């Protein structure tokens, strides 16, 4: 029970504001008595007593969860699963929450580890008592697991697998608590997948819906993240100026002291939109004033910065440097096993090769990427590669 409703004077006020009942036959009245202060006290004590065991258990779980998480993460993935399956110590809902956050963070750095951690939570959720925790709450936990599995697969370029995971997440959400924020999180992640599949109008619609829910709930940073996603969808649709406007709107929602990573992500995408809008000199100047963008600690994200530098180099009239940078980007994505992004980098490199008059190299690159893009379901870029091949 919320604290405000545990005070006798508040409960008395609520009851006093109930409609007065008219007499019924025989002169009897419904709710004819006015309880005394001691009656209120006994009622409140009885209600609170029924919550105390659960409250004490939740507090104990929250206190134990960080230590349990640290213990789990010291082990190999195989050993973690054995512990989750067999040790009652780990049957803790607060531990599920911490594991889900660890999965979310790892899903961007190491998609395989992110998916493994979400799988761990799935197994754990099936071992939690639905009578104690609530069936609908556990359905929300399972939904979040499949959201994170889907996102990890998207990051790993398994776009079909991501779709399957998001469908399963929707099934669990329908059986869950009906939390609008959980639904908004799924809308946001599905929008990211649609953007990766180059289904930009659908992505834009989903980002808008997610941002609206987050804003209505006062969740400003998730709302900003959804607006940034919308800005990128607009940029990829050929509307970079609209993307710039949206990014500046998102900037007003982000506190860099609270979430410096989100602020950095926003700055990176503003530079990207400026380059796409043909404002390459502005993009170059903003990148020079943003050393933190080049110093991103995550190796994969540093590849995105190299890719951005290649686009800026092309925009300011240095295609040779753009080609050198794109070769590095392509090769690094190949080394990481990221065929989707390697193919997109190849397509950019083919365009630069045409600019440099290297027609045969451009044709070879286009022929290489077409089957891979089609296999991934990226029809828009596959068509662009086909047109480039025909015009080269």
Regions found by a protein language model. Give the residues of each.
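C-terminal non-catalytic interaction modules
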Residues: 2, 36-41, 46-47, 54-64, ...
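Alpha-solenoid helical repeat architecture
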Residues: 91, 132-144, 174-185, 189, ...
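Short Cys/His-based metal-binding microdomains
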Residues: 1-9
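Alpha-solenoid helical-repeat scaffolds
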Residues: 83-144, 148-177, 181, 185, ...
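Tandem amphipathic alpha-helical repeat scaffolds
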Residues: 57-68, 96-111, 141-158, 182-198, ...
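Tetratricopeptide repeat
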Residues: 114, 120-124, 162, 168-170, ...
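N-terminal alpha-helical interaction modules that lie
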Residues: 10-119, 123-130
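Amphipathic alpha-helical segments of tetratricopeptide repeats
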Residues: 122-132, 167-178, 208-219, 248-259, ...
């Amino acid at each position: 029970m919320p604290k405000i409703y545990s005070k006798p004077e508040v409960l008395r006020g609520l009851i006093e504001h109930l409609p007065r009942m008219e007499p019924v036959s025989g002169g009897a009245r419904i709710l004819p008595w006015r309880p005394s202060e001691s009656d209120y006290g006994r009622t409140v004590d009885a209600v609170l007593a029924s919550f105390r065991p659960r409250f004490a258990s939740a507090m104990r779980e929250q206190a134990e969860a960080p230590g349990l998480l640290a213990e789990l993460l010291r082990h190999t993935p195989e050993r973690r699963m054995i512990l989750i399956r067999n040790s009652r110590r780990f049957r803790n809902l607060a531990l599920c929450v911490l594991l889900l956050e660890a999965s979310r963070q790892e899903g961007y750095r190491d998609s395989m580890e992110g998916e493994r951690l979400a799988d761990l939570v799935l197994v754990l959720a099936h071992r939690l008592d639905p009578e104690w925790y609530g069936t609908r709450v556990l359905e929300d936990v399972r939904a979040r697991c499949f959201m994170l599995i889907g996102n990890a697969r998207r990051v790993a370029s398994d776009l079909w697998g991501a779709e399957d995971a998001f469908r399963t997440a929707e099934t669990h959400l329908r059986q869950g608590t009906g939390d609008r924020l959980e639904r908004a999180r799924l809308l946001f992640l599905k929008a990211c997948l649609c953007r990766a599949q180059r289904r930009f109008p659908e992505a834009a619609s989903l980002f808008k819906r997610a941002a609206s829910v987050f804003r209505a709930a006062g969740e400003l940073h998730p709302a900003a993240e959804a607006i940034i996603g919308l800005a990128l969808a607009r940029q990829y649709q050929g509307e970079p100026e609209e993307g710039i406007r949206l990014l500046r709107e998102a900037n007003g929602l982000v506190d860099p002291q609270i979430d410096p990573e989100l602020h950095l992500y926003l700055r990176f995408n503003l530079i990207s939109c400026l380059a796409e809008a043909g404002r390459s000199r502005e993009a170059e100047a903003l990148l020079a004033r943003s050393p933190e963008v080049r110093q991103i600690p995550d190796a994969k994200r540093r590849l995105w910065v190299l890719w951005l530098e290649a686009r800026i180099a092309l925009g300011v009239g240095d295609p040779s440097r753009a080609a050198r940078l794109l070769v590095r980007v392509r090769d690094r994505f190949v080394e990481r096993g990221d065929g989707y992004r390697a193919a997109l980098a190849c397509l950019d490199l083919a365009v630069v090769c045409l600019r440099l008059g290297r027609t045969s190299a451009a044709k070879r690159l286009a022929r290489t990427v077409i089957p891979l893009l089609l296999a991934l379901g990226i029809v828009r870029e596959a068509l662009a590669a086909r047109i480039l091949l025909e015009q080269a």
